[in-house]
Swiss-Prot record:
Name listed for the protein in its UniProt record: Urease accessory protein UreF
Coiled coil: none
Species name: Chelativorans sp. (strain BNC1)
HAMAP family assigned to the protein according to its UniProt record, in alphabetical order: UreF
A Pfam cross-reference name: UreF
UniProt keyword annotations, A-Z: Chaperone, Cytoplasm, Nickel insertion
Function summary: Required for maturation of urease via the functional incorporation of the urease nickel metallocenter.
CC per GO annotation: cytoplasm
Length: 223
């Protein structure tokens, strides 16, 4: 494991979690586009509720747990394969399965500049949570810091979807981001210590929206 200072960790996390990092995350909505089309999400209040629900009991929570496990198991190829299989098996919709696999593979390819050896022993396809977690572990980044960056990026991405599809304006989006900061920090700390026994989801509306997305007559996003 590479010894990494806090500032180095911050610098790397800012890079890896940036929308500019070439994983294509801007092309996916994780079912939010369906919720907007169905008018479940129609303004800033409902957008915040949707995002918060996924942080508390949805796919974002499970992805964070799997990411923390991968961070701790970055040297264990068998464990990483098990986490990969579990991550993909827990995905309720085809498009979400494709999203995790595609963004994960893109992340592995882009991240070789930091940890080529770790990237070389990851499963293929490697879903995004496992790829991000393993790379963070290999670079000596703590699970809590990693999850703070990941969950912040998740919230930002969901807000960006809502802004592009009009229900939320830019100022409202920033208000949501600021309001969710305490919850993101709380979940990063809590889930950094979580194990596979803590996996679970009751965000049924989000799962159904992800499944229904492929049948939308007009789609901007790939999930």
């Amino acid at each position: 494991m590479t010894t990494t200072t806090e500032l180095q960790s911050l610098q790397r996390l800012l890079t890896w979690a940036s929308p500019a990092f070439p994983v294509g995350s801007f092309a996916y909505s994780a079912g939010l586009e369906t919720a907007i089309a169905d008018r479940r999400v129609k303004d800033a209040a409902t957008a915040r509720d949707w995002i918060e629900g996924n942080l508390l009991a949805g796919a974002a929570r499970n992805d964070a747990i799997l990411m923390a496990e991968a961070c701790r198991a970055y040297l264990d190829e068998q464990r990483l394969q098990q986490l990969t299989d579990l991550c993909l098996a827990l995905t309720p919709a085809l498009e979400r399965h494709q999203e995790l696999a595609a963004t994960g593979e893109a992340f592995v390819l882009a991240a070789r500049a930091w940890a080529a050896q770790t990237c070389g022993r990851l499963p293929s396809p490697c879903p995004y949570p496992v790829a991000f977690g393993a790379l963070a572990g290999a670079c000596g980044i703590s699970p809590e810091a990693m999850l703070l960056a990941y969950l912040t990026a998740y919230v930002q991405a969901q807000i960006s979807v809502a802004i592009r599809l009009v229900p939320v304006g830019q100022t409202q989006g920033l208000t949501i981001l600021a309001a969710l900061e305490p919850l993101v920090a709380e979940k990063a700390k809590e889930l950094s210590r979580a194990t596979l026994d803590d996996l679970g989801s009751v965000a049924y509306a989000a799962d159904i929206a992800a499944m229904a997305h492929e049948t939308l007559s007009t789609r901007i996003f790939r999930s």
